[in-house]
C-alpha cells in the first residue's frame, strides 16, 4: 500500500492527485448516511464509455496491497495501481450547480473527454 500524505506539494515534488475538501466532505456525508465508518471511497478507471476509458466510484471496506491511499478530512480515498497511472495529476472534486450534483475528475492526462464527463481517452 502506498500512502499519500496531506502535506502541501512542493515545486519539486507535486502531489500525485488532488482530493478536494468539497469531495471529501460529500463522501464523509455519504459514509455517515450508510452508517459504516469502515467505508473508503475507491476511484478507478476501466475500459468503456464512448472515449475508451471511464471513471468509476464505489465504496470499499478493504485496502488492497497495490492501493494508493490519501486521507482528507477523515475520509480515505483508494486508487489501485492500474488506475493510478491514468489519474496522476488529476483533481477529484464534487460540484453542485443548476444542472445537479456530481463528482468530477479534472484529468490532465485525458486528451479527449466525452460530453458526459465520465469517459476519456489518453
UniProtKB/Swiss-Prot annotation:
Query: Is Mitochondrion set as a keyword in this record?
Result: no
Q: Which SUPFAM superfamilies match?
A: HesB-like domain (SSF89360)
Where does the chain bind iron-sulfur cluster? Answer: 50, 114, 116
- Biological process GO annotation list? iron-sulfur cluster assembly
Cofactor binding, per record: Binds 1 iron-sulfur cluster per subunit.
What's a single GO MF annotation on this record? Answer: 2 iron, 2 sulfur cluster binding
Q: Which cysteines are joined by disulfide bonds?
A: none
Keywords, in A-Z order: Iron, Iron-sulfur, Metal-binding
Query: Which InterPro entries does the record match to this protein?
Result: FeS_biogenesis (IPR000361), FeS_cluster_insertion (IPR016092), FeS_cluster_insertion_CS (IPR017870), FeS_cluster_insertion_RrpA (IPR023063), HesB-like_dom_sf (IPR035903)
Transmembrane portions of the chain: none
Essential cofactor(s): iron-sulfur cluster
Indicate the family of this protein.
Answer: Belongs to the HesB/IscA family.
Q: What does this protein do?
A: Required for insertion of 4Fe-4S clusters.
Quaternary assembly? Homodimer.
Q: What is this protein called?
A: Putative iron-sulfur cluster insertion protein ErpA
Q: Specify the species.
A: Cupriavidus metallidurans (strain ATCC 43123 / DSM 2839 / NBRC 102507 / CH34) (Ralstonia metallidurans)
Amino acid at each position: 500500500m502506498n500512502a499519500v500524505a496531506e502535506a502541501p506539494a512542493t515545486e519539486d515534488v507535486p502531489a500525485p492527485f488532488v482530493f478536494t475538501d468539497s469531495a471529501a466532505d460529500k463522501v464523509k456525508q455519504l459514509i455517515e448516511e450508510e452508517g459504516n465508518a469502515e467505508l473508503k471511497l475507491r476511484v478507478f478507471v476501466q475500459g468503456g464509455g464512448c472515449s475508451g476509458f471511464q471513471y468509476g466510484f464505489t465504496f470499499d471496506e478493504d485496502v488492497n496491497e497495490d492501493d494508493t491511499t490519501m486521507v482528507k478530512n477523515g475520509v480515505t480515498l483508494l486508487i489501485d495501481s492500474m488506475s493510478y497511472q491514468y489519474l496522476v495529476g488529476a483533481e477529484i472534486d464534487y460540484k453542485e450547480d443548476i444542472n445537479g450534483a456530481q463528482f468530477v475528475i479534472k484529468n490532465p492526462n485525458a486528451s479527449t473527454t466525452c460530453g458526459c464527463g465520465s469517459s476519456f481517452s489518453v
